[in-house]
A protein has these predicted regions:
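Short glycine-cluster motifs
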Residues: 18-98, 102-105, 114
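Short glycine/threonine-rich loop-to-helix capping motif typified by GTGT followed
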Residues: 110-117
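Short Asp/Glu-rich motifs
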Residues: 58, 111, 142
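Peripheral docking tails and interdomain loops at the edges
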Residues: 1-30, 36-46, 117-209
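Short, small-residue-enriched loops and turns at beta-alpha junctions
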Residues: 107-110, 137-139
Length: 210
């Protein structure tokens, strides 16, 4: 049931993919590895950043971070909003990535809700889904319900369900569109015979029209 609700939210909020690559930007190296493992298990591509993207990451992230994909911003990002903005802009500008996964590893009323609000403009600006991987055990904690209630953010409470949702999203948009069925014979005549707006027909009269 959780998978149904979360995947429905993804389909309702996400536009058509612009690319198949999955970007992961995280303040926690462990959460990034967990995300990468689940993506790899489902065959989701995680291309490494283009040279121009990597240059921005390397100039912004501490030496003990990872200017790659997954992109480990380290906990320093909490004290350096400029670093967060530069890395998010760089990863979302990279044409290889069609969505961006952000693991949320803690739940705090002020900072977590603030982070969710900070993420919203990126989704609107780049037209790519921002998908929150909610890791705290406090499933309805501050920030979670906020993310679910806004149109720009998509939240999953399981990394496995999140990556499966992305795979289904890709599969749906990969379908070959079929031509619409031909209208049945006599449709035009039947429509012309319909009474005017507001008419009430008995059952036999309605059946006789079709």
């Amino acid at each position: 049931f959780d998978a149904l609700l979360e995947t429905a939210s993804l389909f309702a909020k996400a536009p058509k993919p612009t690319a198949k690559g999955v970007a992961i930007v995280t303040p926690s190296g462990g959460a990034g590895i967990m995300a990468a493992d689940h993506a790899e298990a489902l065959g989701l591509p995680m291309p490494q950043p283009l040279p121009a993207t990597e240059a921005v990451l390397r100039s912004s992230i501490p030496d003990f971070g990872a200017p790659r994909n997954p992109c480990d911003l380290t906990a320093q990002v909490a004290a350096n909003p400029q670093m967060f903005d530069a890395c998010m802009e760089a990863m979302l500008s990279d044409p290889q990535y069609g969505c961006l996964v952000v693991p949320q590893v803690y739940s705090h009323f002020q900072t977590t809700v603030g982070r969710m609000e900070q993420l919203r403009p990126y989704a609107a600006k780049f037209g790519k889904p921002l998908i929150i991987a909610w890791i705290p055990e406090q499933l309805e904690g501050p920030g979670a319900c906020h993310a679910e209630s806004v149109p720009e953010l998509i939240l999953f409470r399981s990394m496995r369900r999140l990556m499966q949702g992305i795979r289904l999203w890709h599969d749906y948009h990969d379908r070959v569109e079929e031509a619409p069925p031909a209208p049945p014979a006599g449709l035009d005549a039947a429509l012309a015979a319909l009474p005017g707006k507001g008419a009430v027909l008995m059952e036999a009269e309605a059946k006789a029209l079709f």
